[in-house]
């Protein structure tokens, strides 16, 4: 289905160039920028994601992220005592979701942000998920 394709493209974008041998912050920063750039290059994905969030099938598809790069990152970070002991879904809301929210504000509300501001958001959202 189309919803699954949208979701899979999104997950693939997060994982692009990901290197689990990098320090945890650098891994996080890479995923954050991957999301930001993907949504800037594919702005219709934001509209699609907003439409699909209420569909049961999309919710089930999101649950399939359990073996994703993000989930593994969370498990590894928790095992290393770096990340808070919260579900990966909650950690995502506190961190990488900021890229989606800002991209959405940019597209739908015309609110532009500089790279300096985005780097600050990355650092602050990283602190939000640290132990």
Regions found by a protein language model. Name each.
Residues 1-30, 47:
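Amphipathic alpha-helical linker/stalk segments
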Residues 5-11, 30, 34-41, 55-80, ...:
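Amphipathic alpha-helical packing segments from all-alpha helical-bundle domains
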Residues 13, 17, 38, 128:
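Short alpha-helical functional segments enriched in proximate histidine and acidic residues
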Residues 16, 20-22, 78-85, 131:
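Surface-exposed helix-capping loop/turn segments at secondary-structure junctions
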Residues 19-23, 40, 54, 82, ...:
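Residues in soluble alpha-helical coiled-coils and helical-bundle/repeat scaffolds
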Residues 22-40, 44, 89, 93, ...:
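Amphipathic alpha-helical segments that line or abut small-molecule/effector binding pockets
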Residues 47-51, 78-124:
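Hydrophobic/aromatic-rich alpha-helical bundle segments in the mid-to-C-terminal region
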Residues 73, 124-131:
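C-terminal alpha-helix
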């Amino acid at each position: 289905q189309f919803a699954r394709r949208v979701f899979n493209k999104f997950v693939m974008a997060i994982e692009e160039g990901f290197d689990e041998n990098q320090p945890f912050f650098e891994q996080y920063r890479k995923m954050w920028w991957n999301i930001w750039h993907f949504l800037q290059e594919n702005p219709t994905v934001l509209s699609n994601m907003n439409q699909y969030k209420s569909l049961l099938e999309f919710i089930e598809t999101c649950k399939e992220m359990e073996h994703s790069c993000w989930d593994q990152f969370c498990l590894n970070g928790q095992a290393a005592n770096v990340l808070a002991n919260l579900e990966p879904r909650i950690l995502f809301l506190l961190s990488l979701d900021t890229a989606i929210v800002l991209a959405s504000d940019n597209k739908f509300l015309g609110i532009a942000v500089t790279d300096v501001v985005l780097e600050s958001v990355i650092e602050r959202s990283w602190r939000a998920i640290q132990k």
